[in-house]
C-alpha cells in the first residue's frame, strides 16, 4: 500500500499598467509543496516500509503586453511538478511462474519535474474570433519511465515464492527461481529530456451558415 501526505501553499502577485505607452498585465507566484510518502510491501517473507519526504519550490511568471486592442503577446516561464502514480510506488509486486515474469513498483521514484517556457501571439480579428501562434519548450529534469530487465533471477526481487501460482513450473521447481531466466518489469527514474513544439489555432463562429447551423 502507498500513502501520501501533501502540504503546500501559494503566493501570487498580479499587476497591470502601462510602460512607454504599452499596456501590459503581469503575474508572478511561488508554490511550495511538501510530500511525505509511505510505501509498504513484502520483501522476502517480511513486510517492509519505505518512507521519505521531499520538498518542491515552484516559481512561475507570466506577462502579456497589448500592442493594440486586437493583439496580445504572451510569455510565461514556470517550474512544474507531478507526482508518480501511487500504483508505481509500491515495493510489492506480482509474478508469473509460467512465463518467468515479475512486475513490481519502485518506492524511490522521483516526481516529474520540468521548467516550461511558453510564447504566444493572439490576434482577435473579429468578435468571438481569434488566430494564435504559440511556441513552447519544456526542459524535463526527471520523469518515471517503464523498464524491462532480462536475465534476472526471481530471488533477486525479494518477493516470496508464495506469490507464484502453485501449479506453475517455477513454484514446482524452486531451482528455477535462482536461474537468470526471468524478466523483471518495473519503473525507474528517467535521465531527463527536452520537448519543443509549435501550436497554431483559429477560432471563428460560422455566421455564414444558414438556419440553425448559423454561428
What are these regions (language model features)?
Residues 3-9, 53-57, 103, 113-117, ...:
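Residues that define the transmembrane beta-barrel architecture of outer-membrane proteins
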Residues 25-27, 60, 64, 72-74, ...:
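Residue-level detector of the transmembrane beta-barrel scaffold of outer-membrane proteins
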Residues 9-15, 61-65, 119-123, 200-204:
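Residues on the lipid-exposed face of transmembrane beta-strands in outer-membrane beta-barrel proteins
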Residues 6, 31-37, 78-84, 126-128, ...:
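Structural signature of outer-membrane beta-barrel domains
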Residues 69-116, 137-178:
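Surface-exposed extracellular loop regions of Gram-negative outer-membrane beta-barrel proteins
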Residues 9, 26-34, 73-79, 121, ...:
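Transmembrane beta-barrel strands of outer-membrane/channel proteins
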Residues 18-24, 67-70, 128, 207-215:
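Short loop/turn motifs that connect adjacent beta-strands in outer-membrane beta-barrel proteins
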